[in-house]
């Protein structure tokens, strides 16, 4: 014969919430008719309560990028409930909600100490926690919502501790583990998720940044903040693209954009893969950064000037003079340009007034940046275009003089192929290199835009990355960890 024992689940759940104890019931079997053996009369009944319990999603830390005026973040909650060892949904209607713990400031301080971070508590006027999260009978998951206002945030990392509580039903338990949201105005790499190799960037007179890249008729992108880019067309069309001889097999590589004497000047490499004696440098101009660009033909003829593989040009001004640096794995060279930047400055006999070798044969993709009394010559080394086998990376040397000598941090001359590493590959990014001219934001931070393959999608080509350039105590530049990032705080433009 079965004996029925009835429980009040509400009272049991209430006690479990207070004590989290394991309960037992002591039973004794008695009879007025028969004699019960003493050894069989006592029973200890363990009470296993498989109560429904609601928790936040498994992740204890959420990463949130706030790049829109209003960002809505969904937080998943889930209910754990079983019947006869099988998972079931809720067997009652109930409500719960997200709250900010009363000791939020202390939690942020403890988190920072444990994780060696410097996050601030998210300002209360910058977010709104959604209303009650309602579960109907049968539900096993429901979403909560947090709305964050970008205008209330500065460019830094914030932390928001969260807990889940019930709002009236005593038959449901709630996981009181604190979860955290790391919130920032940040970007995700790649900033251009399609092939746009050898990027060059300029801040134009209209307040927009324009990016030009290798490929077709030179794709052009536009951005207000270096993060969100929109494709707007190409610098050339099929009718206006360069047509100077030799034409056969020519492609436009490694564009370099400048603003000279009220004109947008686009230098480009007129090249054939694998034919170093047939690579030259051309120039085109436009009144607008969007084009249309009018081609002016050859600026540097590799054969005529005596530099094989004449590509990867870089324009720089110093002391009222205009210079062009260029070269690829046959030495980096410098020459002086005319005042309009459209021709090589020459002696009366037709020879260049300047032709100087400044780096050895290990380098290409020159980029020069002046800072703190030094000229920093960035370059790329290794193989650029072999997918997962690419060994491309960015290196640097520096000099007190624009024309060198450029040396590494140990004094080794770049003419002898010495260098200091700036950024290399990792498990996510392969072949990072050919950086654009460095851009300084309104807080004085320098930013580097460059290309790389995605290790898990090399077929996408060389996509575009953005990273903050850091400087060590001796004044040498580097990307954090000497590797591309997946994300970071956005540049500050007010």
Tell what function each PLM region has.
Residues 184-494:
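Carbohydrate-active catalytic/glycan-binding domains of CAZyme proteins
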Residues 1-187:
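Short boundary segments that mark the start of a structured unit
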């Amino acid at each position: 014969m079965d004996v029925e024992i009835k429980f009040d689940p509400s009272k049991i759940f209430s006690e479990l919430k207070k004590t989290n104890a394991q309960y037992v019931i002591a039973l004794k079997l008695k009879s007025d008719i028969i004699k019960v053996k003493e050894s069989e009369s006592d029973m200890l009944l363990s009470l296993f309560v498989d109560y429904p319990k609601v928790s936040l999603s498994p992740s204890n830390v959420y990463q949130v990028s706030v790049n829109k005026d209003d960002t809505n973040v969904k937080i998943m909650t889930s209910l754990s409930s079983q019947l006869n060892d099988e998972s079931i949904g809720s067997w009652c209607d109930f409500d719960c909600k997200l709250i900010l713990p009363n000791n939020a400031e202390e939690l942020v301080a403890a988190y920072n100490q444990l994780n060696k971070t410097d996050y601030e508590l998210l300002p209360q006027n910058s977010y709104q926690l959604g209303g009650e999260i309602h579960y109907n009978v049968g539900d096993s998951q429901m979403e909560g919502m947090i709305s964050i206002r970008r205008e209330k945030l500065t460019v830094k990392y914030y932390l928001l501790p969260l807990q889940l509580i019930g709002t009236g039903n005593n038959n449901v338990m709630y996981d009181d583990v604190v979860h955290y949201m790391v919130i920032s105005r940040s970007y995700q790499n790649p900033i251009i998720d399609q092939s746009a190799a050898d990027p060059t960037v300029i801040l134009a007179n209209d307040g927009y940044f324009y990016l030009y890249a290798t490929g077709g008729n030179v794709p052009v992108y536009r951005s207000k903040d270096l993060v969100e880019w929109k494709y707007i067309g190409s610098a050339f069309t099929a009718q206006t693209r360069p047509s100077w001889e030799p034409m056969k097999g020519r492609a436009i590589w490694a564009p370099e954009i400048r603003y000279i004497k009220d004109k947008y000047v686009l230098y480009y490499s007129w090249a054939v893969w694998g034919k170093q004696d047939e690579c030259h440098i051309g120039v085109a101009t436009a009144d607008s950064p969007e084009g249309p660009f009018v081609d002016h033909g050859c600026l540097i003829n590799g054969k005529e000037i005596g530099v094989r593989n004449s590509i990867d040009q870089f324009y720089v001004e110093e002391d009222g003079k205009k210079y062009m640096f260029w070269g690829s794995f046959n030495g980096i060279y410098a020459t002086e340009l005319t005042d309009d930047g459209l021709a090589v400055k020459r002696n009366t006999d037709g020879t260049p007034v300047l032709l100087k070798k400044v780096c050895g044969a290990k380098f290409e993709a020159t980029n020069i940046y002046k800072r703190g009394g030094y000229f920093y010559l960035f370059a790329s080394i290794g193989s650029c275009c072999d997918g997962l086998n690419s060994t491309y990376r960015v290196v640097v040397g520096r000099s007190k003089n624009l024309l060198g000598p450029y040396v590494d941090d140990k004094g080794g001359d770049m003419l002898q192929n010495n260098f200091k590493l700036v950024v290399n590959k990792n498990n996510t990014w392969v072949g990072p290199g050919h950086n654009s001219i460095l851009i300084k934001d309104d807080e004085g931070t320098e930013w580097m835009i460059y290309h790389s393959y995605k290790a898990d999608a090399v077929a996408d080509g060389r996509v575009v990355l953005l990273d903050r350039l850091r400087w060590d105590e001796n004044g040498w530049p580097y990307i954090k960890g000497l590797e591309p990032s997946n994300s970071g705080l956005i540049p500050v433009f007010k």
